[in-house]
Structures are given as structure tokens and as C-alpha cells.
């Protein structure tokens, strides 16, 4: 029996990701990116090619970021990203992603990026660069908005139960309750 997995934000570690997929015996039908900054999509082409997975992004992100801005960030980081991946699936707030018995709700959490999303389900939320352990995402890139970022966090993420595990795009995991009590940006 084949088990399916979901890859979220395959940054720049295609080999490590594909090794884990192989070791776990997973098939990957879908790659979801929380936002299209290069450090979250760098491995998409290689992982997509190796797994045959479809790529899913929020509709606002697909129109803004999957092209020029990703190339700009790539060149700033010393990388090469001449052929940005094109998504097969456009996501909207409230969509449900179902993979092998797992169900995640798409929460549109713009601010760090116009089409930024978080994925919530099974007592956890993957926040990309929206919410960190005692921090929030940057809002000084083109298309970012600090006001919108804080509003997204307060209305979409802080409404989740306190014991919800938060897995940010960078840094250690935390909980919604811990961030509600101690995040200085909120």
C-alpha cells in the first residue's frame, strides 16, 4: 500500500527532501508553498520533477511572485532560478487540502507576501514566514505590509486554540498560546 505525503515549502534541500521521501516510502501528489520567496521554493523544480507532484500556491501569490520576484531573490542569494515553476493548483482562503487522511485548511495570511498562507489541521499550523517563535515575518519587501501581517496573525492565527503547535518556516516550533502570551510584536 502506497502512503502519500505532502511537502510544504521545499527550500533549497532537494536531495535531503527526496532522500526522506524515499526512506519513508512516500508518494508525493502535492507540493504546497506558503509563499513564493526563494528560500521556500528553491527546491520546487527538482522535487516536482522527481516526484511528479503538482504545485499549489495561493492565487494572489501565483500572479505576483512565481516569476520575476523569485528570480530577484534568487540572484540576491547567489542562486540561479531562470525557470520558475508554474502552479497547477491555485488555493483560496478556506480551501481544504486532503492527502492520505490528512486534512489541512488554507488560511490566507498575507502581509509578509500578498498570497501568503498558513496550513491548519490536526492540532498544528504551518505558518511559513508569517509567525515565528517570538517573532513575525519581515514586511519590508515589495508587496509586503506590516499592518496586513499583524492583522493576519491576530484574525487568522490567534483565533486558533492555545495548544495548536506552530511550525514556522524558520526556527523552532512554538504554540499559539505561547505566542499569544509572549510575542512582543503582538
Predicted regions located by residue number:
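Conserved beta-strand hairpin/beta-sheet module of binuclear metal-dependent hydrolase folds
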Residues: 1-24, 118-127, 132-133
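Secondary-structure boundary motif
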Residues: 1, 23, 49, 159-162
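Active-site HxH/HxHxD metal-binding segment of metal-dependent hydrolases
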Residues: 13-96, 184-185
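Metallo-beta-lactamase
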Residues: 69-74, 96, 103-108, 113-186
Amino acid at each position: 500500500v502506497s502512503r502519500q505525503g505532502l511537502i510544504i515549502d521545499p527550500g533549497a534541500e532537494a536531495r535531503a527532501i527526496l532522500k526522506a521521501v524515499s526512506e519513508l516510502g512516500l508518494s508525493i501528489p502535492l507540493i504546497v508553498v506558503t509563499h513564493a520567496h526563494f528560500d521556500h521554493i528553491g527546491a520546487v523544480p527538482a522535487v516536482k520533477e522527481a516526484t511528479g507532484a503538482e504545485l499549489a500556491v495561493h492565487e494572489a501569490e501565483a500572479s505576483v511572485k512565481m516569476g520575476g520576484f523569485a528570480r530577484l531573490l534568487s540572484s540576491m542569494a547567489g542562486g540561479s532560478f531562470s525557470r520558475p515553476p508554474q502552479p497547477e493548483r491555485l488555493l483560496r482562503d478556506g480551501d481544504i487540502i486532503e492527502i492520505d487522511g490528512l486534512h489541512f485548511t488554507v488560511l490566507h495570511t498575507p502581509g509578509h507576501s500578498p498570497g501568503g498562507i498558513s496550513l491548519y489541521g490536526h492540532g498544528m499550523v504551518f505558518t511559513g514566514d508569517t509567525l515565528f517563535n517570538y517573532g513575525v515575518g519581515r514586511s519590508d519587501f515589495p508587496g509586503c505590509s506590516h499592518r496586513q501581517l499583524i492583522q493576519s496573525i491576530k484574525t487568522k492565527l490567534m483565533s486558533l486554540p492555545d495548544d495548536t503547535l506552530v511550525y514556522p518556516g524558520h526556527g523552532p516550533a512554538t504554540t499559539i498560546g505561547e505566542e499569544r502570551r509572549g510575542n512582543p510584536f503582538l
